[in-house]
Design a protein with these regions (language model features):
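S-adenosyl-L-methionine
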Residues: 1-23
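Active-site segment flanking the S-adenosylmethionine/decSAM binding pocket
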Residues: 15-43
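Short, glycine- and charge-enriched coil/turn segments that flank and shape catalytic ligand pockets
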Residues: 19-20, 46-48, 97-100, 140-147
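Glycine-rich nucleotide phosphate-binding loop and flanking beta-alpha elements
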Residues: 32-34, 60, 98
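C-terminal substrate-binding/active-site "lid" region of AdoMet-derived donor-dependent transferases
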Residues: 40-93
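Core SAM-dependent methyltransferase catalytic element
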Residues: 85-109
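An accessory alpha-helical subdomain
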Residues: 102-171
Length: 171
């Protein structure tokens, strides 16, 4: 069975795995920054073209552009639900990926060919989160918050456009 073909190790990141020992690596249940740090400490993962199955619990908007800058491409994203929580899983390999828009950094890329029944709910939730952040920053009187506000407004507009686009693509 599957248990004979898999090996599990407890180690700091990928430090306990030699480069030739793995062709597929799953990193799940931690934040996007932690996932990026684990991959940054193991450049052999990209060099060997390992398949990565990543499930960031937070900071997806930091992980996606980090992957792009480091020479990875996101081949596929899949949404799943447990209770009221939506989770994103990324299938990633070494390779070129076009730069992501600010909204795509939050939500991932979408295309007409993507069939995901949770996508509309996901986009709606992200758009609402961005709107709340924009509202909060608009209350700020600190000049240092202006660039963050402008960036979040761009994210919010992009997410709204992605949601509208997604709706028009549905049968």
């Amino acid at each position: 069975g599957l248990a004979e073909r898999m090996e599990f190790r407890l180690c700091d990141g990928l430090s306990g795995i030699a480069p030739a020992e793995a062709d597929t690596i799953a990193i799940a249940g931690m934040g996007g920054e932690t996932i990026a740090a684990i991959l940054a400490a193991a450049p052999w993962v990209r060099e060997q073209g390992c398949l990565l199955l990543l499930q960031p619990m937070s900071a997806q908007s930091a992980l996606r552009p980090w992957l792009q800058r480091q020479g990875y491409r996101i081949e596929r994203e899949h949404l799943s639900r447990e209770g009221d929580t939506l989770y994103t899983a990324l299938q990633v390999r070494a390779g070129f990926m076009e730069a992501l828009t600010p909204a795509e950094q939050w939500a991932g890329r979408q295309s007409r060919e993507t069939a995901d029944p949770l996508r509309l709910e996901y986009l709606t939730r992200l758009e609402a989160r961005a709107a709340r952040a924009v509202t909060g920053l608009r209350r700020s009187t600190r000049a240092s918050d202006v660039p963050r506000l402008e960036a979040l407004e761009a994210v919010h507009r992009g997410l709204a456009k992605m949601r509208e686009e997604w709706i028009t693509w549905q049968p």
